């Protein structure tokens, strides 16, 4: 590392939970603690200044990051990693409070732990609903990797259970590979329904643990509803997104 550079990381959380590999927790192959890391090495080994305060917005013309506590950080170069925010406005009867009973487990450790505990407490012979959104969203193959690892857990601990994937899409990434693997490893445990076959979620009943599609209502003992997403708020507030709500990317250079 060039010691002439002064690097500051603005991050409100005291520890970092890796969303990559979080499906291994749901599959019973890793513990939450194995995916949780502190920022101490960045400070101690590399001299990076870690500020545990959320960034509020970026003033691009003056090259300033304004923090939630009002402090301002001047920069020569800023790298923005806004993450994603959930869209709770696209499904009827669905809001932020419903993630308690229908966890998305798509960001943060608390939601992943909640889904993990629901899988542990569901009865053998129960039904898991996994409801992926339409593209684009973070990690397009993720819901299908998740279905695979949940099936791994269920096949060992609750083998009479089933997984229904109610998908807003007509097809999904790496579909042929996933479908072949599901059939070979788990038989008929996993069923996938595309949007035109009843996979598109129109509204939810969080108290009744049910989702409604144009073909009727589907109940689940566990419902992993993954909502539509867009770029994190700081990107939207700082003018970094386009009309889609996402940050445009030059695919030639990324």
Where are these regions (language model features)?
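Glycine-rich dinucleotide-binding loop and its adjacent helix/turn
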Residues: 82-157
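A conserved beta-strand/loop capping segment in the N-terminal third of enzymes
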Residues: 42-93, 126
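A Rossmann-like FAD-binding core segment of flavoenzymes
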Residues: 45-58, 62-65, 73, 151-251
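FAD-site-proximal beta/loop scaffold in flavoenzymes
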Residues: 89, 93-122, 219-254
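Beta1-alpha1 glycine-rich phosphate/pyrophosphate-binding loop at the start
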Residues: 1-49, 134-176
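A general structural motif
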Residues: 4, 125-126, 160, 220
């Amino acid at each position: 590392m060039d010691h002439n550079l002064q690097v500051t990381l603005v991050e409100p959380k005291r520890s970092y939970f890796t969303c990559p590999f979080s499906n291994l927790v749901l599959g019973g192959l890793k513990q939450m603690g194995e995916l949780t890391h502190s920022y101490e090495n960045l400070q101690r080994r590399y001299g990076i200044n870690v500020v545990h305060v959320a960034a509020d917005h970026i003033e691009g013309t003056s090259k300033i990051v304004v923090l939630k506590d009002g402090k301002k950080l001047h920069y020569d170069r800023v790298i923005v990693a806004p993450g994603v925010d959930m869209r709770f406005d696209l499904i009827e009867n669905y809001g932020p409070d419903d993630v308690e009973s229908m966890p998305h487990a798509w960001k943060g450790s608390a939601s992943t732990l909640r889904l993990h505990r629901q899988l542990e407490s569901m009865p053998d012979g129960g039904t898991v609903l996994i409801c992926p959104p339409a593209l684009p969203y973070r990690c397009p193959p993720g819901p299908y990797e998740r279905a695979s690892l949940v099936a791994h857990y269920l096949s060992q601990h609750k083998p009479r259970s089933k997984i229904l994937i109610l998908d807003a899409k007509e097809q999904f990434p790496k579909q042929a590979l996933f479908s072949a693997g599901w059939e070979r490893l788990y038989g008929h445990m996993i069923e996938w329904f595309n949007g035109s076959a009843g996979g598109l979620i129109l509204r939810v009943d969080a108290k009744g643990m049910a989702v409604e599609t144009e073909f009727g209502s589907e109940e689940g003992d566990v419902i992993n509803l993954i909502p539509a997403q867009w770029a994190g708020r700081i990107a939207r507030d700082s003018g970094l997104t386009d009309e889609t709500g996402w940050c445009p990317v030059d695919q030639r250079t990324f």
